[in-house]
Amino acid sequence: MKLRTQMLLVTLLAVALVIGGLYIGANYYLLSGTEEIEQNSIIETDNQFLKLLEYDLHHLSILTTDWGYWDDTYIFMDDFNQEYIDSNLVDSTFYDGGLNVILYFFPNGTYAYGKAYDLMADTEVPVPASLLEDIQIRKLIGSGSLLRKSTGLINTDEGPMAIAAVPILTSDEYGPMRGSLVMGYYLGDAHIQKLSEYMPSPVEIYSLEDSAAFAGIPQDTLKSYNDQVWIATEGIDTIHSVFVIDDIFEEKAFYGRTSMDRDIYRLGLT
């Protein structure tokens, strides 16, 4: 073989190796880029749910404040008149407001009156004693809590619940305070499904003690981000995210979980 031919072949081989290296490198960075995009996308989905939940809690706070800062409620805490009950604590109030409980407490935190409603069965039910105990033990109402509003999530025997607690004042926001008003609803499957209608993928909620939050997620691909978000991939088809949800005391209390199709990643493979 002539020297010129050998040099040409060597040159072509070198060019091929360079092109191949560039292709492999470009493909690597492209896949890395698509992985980052899909991770950011699912984290944004998590944040979107948290914002929707925050908006939901804000609406609950407004509703509870409207009732708590109201002359009729203020008078009711003095005489517990039947007219107030018949006019306000009716089934339609719970159904239209999406509420499971409306509870009244004396200034010292003692339970005074309340009603509970099963939205799925569309009927009144007894107020869970465990819920009253949770509210009182956590000091969401009573002395020291009456001067402020509290809105957020608590974990109950019946599951996660969104609650708002406000002092009971006159319509002009004068006292003396006659107790606390608490309104709340369970974050059950139906309510979560309703929130998920505004999101690209559904969300599930678990307590911190529930191992089901990570069930079926490949542990070998699971990565933690500041102990607030965990992301894992399942082949080229699915990406999962588990994220922390704080309670009313701004402490870790629940896990949220989302799963999305890896269409962005598969696009990078083509």
Q: Residue locations for each model-derived region?
A:
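Alpha-helical transmembrane signal-anchor/signal-peptide segments
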Residues: 31-43
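Extracellular/periplasmic ligand-binding regions of membrane signal-transduction receptors
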Residues: 40-87, 107-110, 115-126, 196-215
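Extracytoplasmic/periplasmic ligand-binding sensor regions of membrane-associated signaling proteins
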Residues: 58, 70, 75, 93-180
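A short beta-strand signature within small-molecule sensing/ligand-binding domains used
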Residues: 147-151, 158-170, 226-230, 234-244, ...
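Short hydrophobic beta-strand segments that form the core of ligand-binding sensory/regulatory domains
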Residues: 180-184, 244, 253-257
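Membrane-interface helix-start motif
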Residues: 255-270
